[in-house]
Amino acid sequence: MLVVHSKQELEEHLAEWRRQGDHVALVPTMGNLHVGHLSLVQLAREHAERVVVSIFVNPTQFGESEDFDQYPRTLERDTLRLKKSAADLIFAPDVETIYPFGLKDATTVSVPRITENFCGASRPGHFDGVTSVVARLFALVQPDLAVFGQKDYQQQLVIRHMSLDLNLPVAIITGATIREEDGLAMSSRNQYLSESERSTAPVLYEVLSAAGEELQNGGRDFAKLESESVTKLKDAGFDVDYFSIRRAQNLEIPDRDCDELVVLVAAVLGDARLIDNTVITI
């Protein structure tokens, strides 16, 4: 497996693969990899002969009061993990490679509407940072496909919108959320949880699953179900950002006849902001 840091090195290897007729998949990450990330790498391998994993802690998707400085940088450990995976190349650029004009003069890619609620409302500028860095990675790697996780449900919808709207020739594939044995969605931020908070954290998925089951069984009082779920989470000690039932394809408010729903939740427990979702097809 190769580890490259510069645009030139990346282009040299990509050119060789293209000459061989290989398809290239990209798995964008910020590092601090866990089993969930590795599952995305494996999914990428199922769709392409070559897999590039990018590791870049992107400053433009963090707010001023967020955890950019504290976010773990674990390239050495990540490299060891990826050597045992289906990855062919790690692309670990510096900020200057991704933003050659600097952060203040960087071009911003902004997707309207679908970014205005949920994580977009709670984290102003976050999705502009995500789409801007993903567009740059697409331009540098020029992958045939890219793989994102369902845990970041709104994010993968935003990236799909961007790719379609800009006619980017990149197929977007979504990988299933990978969970701990107790149901907690795997996340690099789970390590912020204290021991007692970690024992409480699975309640998030329990409440989410209960709401999903209610919808699957025909429940259609969305407002009541949202309110009851928020109360359960607050009672367990969560500071709830949102708990919302929406149309799965566009996050718009559903009517009672909608046959594909997504339940979205974000809540803070201690120093960790946890997000999760479940998709319900009726």
Predicted segments, located by residue:
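Phosphate/ribose-recognition catalytic cores of enzymes acting on nucleotide-derived substrates
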Residues: S227-I282
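Nucleotidyltransferase catalytic core that binds NTPs
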Residues: L2-F238, R246, N250
